[in-house]
Amino acid sequence: CIRDSMLTVREHFGKLKGLKLVYMGDARYNMGNSLMVACSKLGMHFVACTTKKYFPNAELVAQCEEYAKASGGSITLTEDVQEGTKDADVIYTDVWVSMGEPDEVWTERIHDLTPYKVTKDVMKNAGEKAIFLHCLPAFHDLKTKIGKEMGERFNLTDKEVTDEVFESEQS
């Protein structure tokens, strides 16, 4: 997923070095960590935009800061959606609950991460040139079995990204 995402970004922008990639959501696990490592080694500016509870492990952040220093990139952790997404080239998210985690974590994640949902306003703040990426599968509507179940259970029509963004030209 990471290699494919980086190839997509390079194809779209013609480069990777110097671009700003913002990961919104739970940045403690595979996608957030892998994107942070990749961006730091490729000279990109990685931003984890989430509540502090979901920031990446401090040791990994320190290692990635060293990689970024050598490559010309940077690592930023922020809870501020406006600040974090401003002038971003790439807005990236993933499902809020990883494979193998119990259903009980949904309530907590939805509560904690709803402010970090990728919306039209987030993309507008990033700018017209910004693109949206998702590792997939995405819960952006109620058309899947799990999407429908979560919608009924939590009275939601989407989770980590709105259907409007997921189906947009920026996606």
Model-inferred region functions:
Residues L42, A126-E128, E167-E169:
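Short, structured coil segments at secondary-structure junctions
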Residues E65-V161:
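Rossmann-like adenosine-cofactor binding region
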Residues A38, V122, E164:
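Hydrophobic/aromatic ligand-binding patch that stacks against planar heteroaromatic rings
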Residues E11-T93, M99:
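Glycine-rich phosphate/diphosphate-binding loop of Rossmann-like nucleotide-binding domains
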Residues V161-S171:
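Short helix/strand-capping connector loops at secondary-structure junctions
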Residues C1-I2:
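Short, small-residue-biased leader/transition segments that mark boundaries at the very start
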